[in-house]
Structures are given as structure tokens and as C-alpha cells.
Amino acid sequence: MAVWQAASGKVYLPPSTPVARVQSTDEYVQRTNIYYHAYSDRLLTVGHPYFNVYDVNSAKIKVPKVSGNQHRVFRLKLPDPNRFALADMSVYNPDKERLVWACRGIEIGRGQPLGVGSVGHPLFNKVGDTENPSSYKTQPNSTDDRQNVSFDPKQLQMFIIGCAPCLGEHWDKAIPCATDNPPPGSCPPIELINSAIQDGDMADIGYGNLNFKALQQNRSDVSLDIVNETCKYPDFLKMQNDVYGDSCFFYARREQCYARHFFVRGGKTGDDIPAGQIDEGSMKNAYYIPPMNDQAQYKIGNSMYFPTVSGSLVSSDAQLFNRPFWLQRAQGHNNGICWFNQLFVTVVDNTRNTNFSISVNPENADVSKIENYKAESFQEYLRHVEEYELSLILQLCKVPLTAEVLAQINAMNANILEEWQLGFVPAPDNPIHDTYRYIDSAATRCPDKNPPKEREDPYKNMKFWDVDLTERLSLDLDQYSLGRKFLFQAGLQQTTVNGTKTLSSRVSTRGIKRKRKN
């Protein structure tokens, strides 16, 4: 007998309100055929590879920390194209349009030879080697078994291009719940934190993206360069799912490492191996069989195992730098438009990680007159140097000042319209205002307590390597290495129209092949 039954499945209805659609910049930004080449000076930095060196008489930094494992974040300042004195005034209408820059190509130049740098700690928390032990090593009676250990970090090459700072992630100490009431010495809860990657932030060298300063109180579990730092890693998942995609137009990454040594930590184990799972009458737990009382294994060793990583071979065959990259389509909705006339370039490269060893005789004695070598007669110093050069291909673009476009930009970032001086200016209620000459003197009234403030830099509290390119632009692309590469790969040729150099497609003609007569 057939019986009708109501559908038991759930019915999903569309949202009552329409979902706002974010447009791509290609839908409202009009690109021109005018291109500029921008380049920086040779950017150099020198410092100590492990820590800041302070003046003994004050807290002033004498030698800054410059490590090959740090992030270098360049903030490139571009000129305002709306203030350009263009020879061809038909390029855009300032009453109906605004000009912006679009990044079409970039080359990050790196100087200095390839080299492997070592990191370490003179008091490294390493009790023994657990890779190939020949005898069972019990926990010694000594209260301090730290060793002087060094190793090479994980090999890392990476750069990220965007018009906003790169978003990073790291694990940090979290606040426990009030109802938990953990006892002293308990492992604290940890949480994932997102923050902008700034210049000088340490990258992951093989021990994870962690706040080591807050979560490793023994100050001996990692190397000196990160023991008092926070290692950050770019949050690619969040940047790829960003609505606008300003933090990352595109990126290139190459990581490489392998476990070279296997050690065990010293100290008391916080999480003991579970021994409560007792079998029926066998007195055996689920993880090991208890040893005899007269054996060395009776006092079970530490189970805090960890490897020391190695970046292995450094080769010029796998370099991301000193080569051009062209941007045709960005991963987000922002297809390379440099809002606020700025570009952020986040770089990590520890394939040029050589640390210079400099030895100095404190007595300033002539080397030829030193008879015998004594180690205490020389002072050893470490220095690390880095060399960069940035080149860009910028395309001039137009943004029409229509209601739809302005609404889209206002929803994205209203400060862009303020910078374009498109804010609503009310009519003055009184054309005549009072202006005092000696407003700061005691004879006149107090000045206004709330004077109008200029728009503050949203990144003023962040640390970046500022590079001014406002006077480093050129229309002569064929006079520069990156410009010639761009003209060749795009199949373009440079022409001059009304005093403005533009690019047009190169058309090649072939002669008619005649048939050979017999």
C-alpha cells in the first residue's frame, strides 16, 4: 500500500537580503598604454646576526641586529600620478577621473655570494643524542647539562607583494579559563595570533612560528637569534581568502629542510607517559614494559625529543631573486592597483647567510710583530651584511568618478576618497572669520583645543624599510634592464605621442616565399 510521507530533509532558503558583491579592479579601473620604470638605490644594512649590541653606559643600541633569517619589509613610496605634469593632457580628465598606479612587474635584486650561516646557543638544552645511542643514558645527577650547540637553519626564500602589509601568524600564550584554575607549573594554553609582518621580524628557521620569549622560560631551547623573539609565518590561507586581496597580489616561496640531528631535552617532563592503563593482572601499561629494578632503564629517561633541522645545499639553480616576475592576474580582487601610492615588498632569503668573523687585537699591535698566538690576545666579532635593489614596472591607470565606482571604493576604504580630495565640503556659514596675530600670548584668548588634524599614517607604529621612489621614475623603459625585459616579453615597442612615451604592439611582416624554379 502506497503511503505519502512528507520530505524529511531540510529545506535551505536563500538569504533574505542580497549579498554584496565585491568587484575586481579590472571592472572599474581603465588601464592606459603608458608605463614607467622605477628603481631604488643599492640598499645595504650591516649588524650583528644574533642580537642587538647595546652601549654599556646606556640603553642605546650600538649595533643593530641584522640576520639573514629576518623578514625585510620594504615600503615603497610612489609619486602621486594626479600631480604629474603630463605632456599629453588627453590622457585623463581630472574632473571626471583619477590616476592610480598598477604594478606590472618586479625584480628583487640581491647582492653578495651564496653562503650558509649557522645559529646556535652556548647553553643549549640538549642532554644527549638519541639518533644512534650505544648505551642507555639516564638522567644525570647534575642540575645543568646544557651544551654549546650550533646548526644551520631551514632554507627559506620568499617574497610577497601587496599594497598593504603582509599578514603573519604565530602561536602565543593564551589566557586560561577562570574555571580551570590550573596549578603552578602547568602548560599554558596557546592560541593563534594574526599580526602584520614588520621589518626585522624573525622567520621560521625550523622550530615553528612561536612566541619563544613568552613560552620558553628556560631561554635554552632554541638558538640565540630567536630565543627572545617571536617567529612569524605568512598567513597565506587568510590572505588568499581576503575579500580585496591588498596584502598579497602574488607571492613566490621555496622552503627546504631535513632533520640532521636528533636530541632530547633536559629538565623534568611535564606530561608523563601514561601508566594508568593497566592490563588485567599483568601490571603492564599500554606504552612500555617496566624494567627491572637493577637496570639502568629503571629510571626512565626523558621523552622530550626534537630534531635540529638543516637547510642542506644552497645552489644558484633554485633562486627566486635576480629575475623578473610579471603580474597578469592577482590572486585577489585587487589586480595590482597600488592604493595610496605605496607598495609593500616582504622578503626572506637566508641563502646568502654568511656571517663575517672579524678579529681585532685590543693592543693595536702590528701583526708582523706578534711572536706567539694567544687566543685571549684577540677579540672576535660577528657581522652580517645584506644587499638589495628593487626595480618595478608601473602602469598608469584611470579610475572614473562615477557613483557606482565611488560607492565601491568607499565601502573598501573611505580614506582613498579623502586622499583624492573628494570629501563633501559644506558651504561656509560665515565667510568672515576672526584671526588673531599673537594667538599664543597671554593677552589673547586660548587657541582652539581641537585644531583640525591631518590624516594619520595607519602604519606609523609599525617598522618598515622606507624607500622613496617619488623621484626615481622614468618613461625610458629601454634604458633599464627590467624595462628591456618587459618590452621583449610583452612584444611591445616604445613610441612618442604628443611628448608622452607610450607602448604599442610590435608588428612583424614577412616576405612572400617564392617557389624555386626547376
From Swiss-Prot:
GO terms for molecular function: structural molecule activity. Residues 131-142 have a biased composition (Polar residues). It is found in: Virion; Host nucleus. The keyword Disulfide bond applies. Pfam families: Late_protein_L1 (PF00500). GO terms for biological process: endocytosis involved in viral entry into host cell; virion attachment to host cell. Its main location: virion. InterPro entries: Capsid_L1_Papillomavir, Capsid_L1_sf_Papillomavir, dsDNA_vir_gr_I_capsid. The keyword Lyase does not apply. Keywords: Capsid protein, Disulfide bond, Host nucleus, Host-virus interaction, Late protein, T=7 icosahedral capsid protein, Viral attachment to host cell, Viral penetration into host cytoplasm, Virion, Virus endocytosis by host, Virus entry into host cell. GO terms for cellular component: host cell nucleus; T=7 icosahedral viral capsid. Residues 127-149 are annotated as: Disordered. Forms an icosahedral capsid with a T=7 symmetry and a 50 nm diameter. The capsid is composed of 72 pentamers linked to each other by disulfide bonds and associated with L2 proteins. Binds to heparan sulfate proteoglycans on cell surface of basal layer keratinocytes to provide initial virion attachment. This binding mediates a conformational change in the virus capsid that facilitates efficient infection. The virion enters the host cell via endocytosis. During virus trafficking, L1 protein dissociates from the viral DNA and the genomic DNA is released to the host nucleus. Belongs to the papillomaviridae L1 protein family. Self-assembles into homopentamers. The capsid has an icosahedral symmetry and consists of 72 capsomers, with each capsomer being a pentamer of L1. Interacts with the minor capsid protein L2; this interaction is necessary for viral genome encapsidation. Interacts with protein E2; this interaction enhances E2-dependent replication and transcription activation. This is Major capsid protein L1.
